[in-house]
Design a protein with these regions (language model features):
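Bacterial N-terminal signal peptides that target proteins for export
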Residues: 1-8
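C-terminal motif of bacterial Sec signal peptides marking the signal peptidase cleavage site
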Residues: 16-19
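Bacterial signal peptide processing site
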Residues: 21-23
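Short coil/turn motif common to extracellular beta-sandwich-like domains
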Residues: 29-38
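Extracellular/mature segments of secreted proteins
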Residues: 36-37, 61-68, 128-133
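Structural motif
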Residues: 40-45
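Tryptophan-paired
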Residues: 48-100
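Extracytosolic low-complexity repeat regions of secreted or lipid-anchored proteins
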Residues: 77-134
Length: 135
C-alpha cells in the first residue's frame, strides 16, 4: 500500500513538473521580417531614382519592369529619403546607385552599414542609422 501511494505521489509530482518544462516554451512562430535602411540623398543634386545591390543581387533598376521576379530587395521613396528594404539579411556593405530623371547613373558607391540586431530569442528586424550620402 505504501509503495502504491509513493508511486502515485511520484507520478503526480512528475506530471505537475512536466508543465514547467514544456518543449514548446521557447518555440518561435514561423514568421519572417524585413530589414531596412534609409538613405538620405538630399546633398546629391538631381537624384530621381535609387538602386542598391547586395553582392550580386540588386533591387530593380529604374525604368525596368517591376513585376515580381522573386527579389526581396526593393526601394521606396519616402519623405525623409529612400528606404532600402532587404530580406532578413543585414549585410555589412551595399552598393548604392543614384540615377537622374533620364535614368542615367550619376553616382555609385559602396556604403557600410552598422546594424543594431534584435536580442529577442526568436530574432527580429535589425535597425540601422540613416545613411547620409555626400556629393
Amino acid at each position: 500500500m505504501r509503495r502504491t501511494a509513493a508511486v502515485i505521489l511520484t507520478g503526480l509530482l512528475l506530471l505537475g513538473l512536466a508543465g514547467c518544462a514544456s518543449p514548446f516554451q521557447n518555440a518561435c512562430p514561423a514568421i519572417g521580417w524585413l530589414n531596412a535602411v534609409t538613405v538620405d540623398t538630399s546633398a546629391v543634386p538631381g537624384v530621381s531614382a535609387v538602386q542598391f545591390c547586395v553582392e550580386s543581387e540588386c533591387s530593380p533598376a529604374p525604368g525596368s519592369e517591376t513585376d515580381d521576379d522573386g527579389s526581396l530587395l526593393w526601394v521606396n521613396a519616402e519623405e525623409d529619403g529612400w528606404v532600402l528594404s532587404l530580406d532578413m539579411s543585414a549585410p555589412e556593405a551595399i552598393t548604392i546607385r543614384l540615377f537622374d530623371a533620364n535614368n542615367l547613373l550619376i553616382r555609385e558607391s559602396e556604403e557600410s552599414i552598422s546594424w543594431t540586431h534584435s536580442d529577442d530569442p526568436c530574432g527580429g528586424p535589425s535597425t540601422a542609422e540613416t545613411l547620409i550620402l555626400k556629393p
